[in-house]
From Swiss-Prot:
Membership in a protein family: Belongs to the complex I subunit 4L family.
This protein's record includes keyword Transport: yes
Pfam families: Oxidored_q2
Catalytic activity line of the entry: a plastoquinone + NADH + (n+1) H(+)(in) = a plastoquinol + NAD(+) + n H(+)(out); a plastoquinone + NADPH + (n+1) H(+)(in) = a plastoquinol + NADP(+) + n H(+)(out)
Membrane protein topology class: Multi-pass membrane protein
Name assigned to this protein: NAD(P)H-quinone oxidoreductase subunit 4L, chloroplastic
Native organism: Capsella bursa-pastoris (Shepherd's purse)
Length: 101
């Protein structure tokens, strides 16, 4: 694939995730948009690693590291969301003041 096509696709994914993160009022949707942003960044890592240096796997290894961190972030985020839902019966961001106290 041409480098520009992949970068444009990655930019679209990043912007969709950023728009969803800014406008979403649901915590689960915000976590999904954050994962979309991280996947767009991973796509850039793999693309630049393949385009600039085929012999080394630094971009691919860093991508795997980011995927592992994103999985841990998603698990912790969903645990926090389920705890807030159990206590408040809502997953709306603007109604949750549990962390302010």
């Amino acid at each position: 694939m041409i480098l520009e096509h992949v970068l444009v696709l990655s930019a679209y994914l990043f912007l969709i995730g950023l728009y969803g993160l800014i406008t979403s009022r649901n915590m689960v949707r915000a976590l999904m948009c954050l994962e979309l942003i991280l996947n767009a960044v991973n796509m850039n890592f793999v693309t630049f690693s393949d385009f600039f240096d085929n012999s080394q796997l630094k971009g691919d290894i860093f991508c795997i590291f980011v995927i592992a961190i994103a999985a841990a972030e998603a698990a912790i985020g969903l645990a926090i969301v389920s705890s807030i839902y159990r206590n408040r019966k809502s997953t709306r961001i603007n109604q949750s003041t549990l962390l302010n106290k």
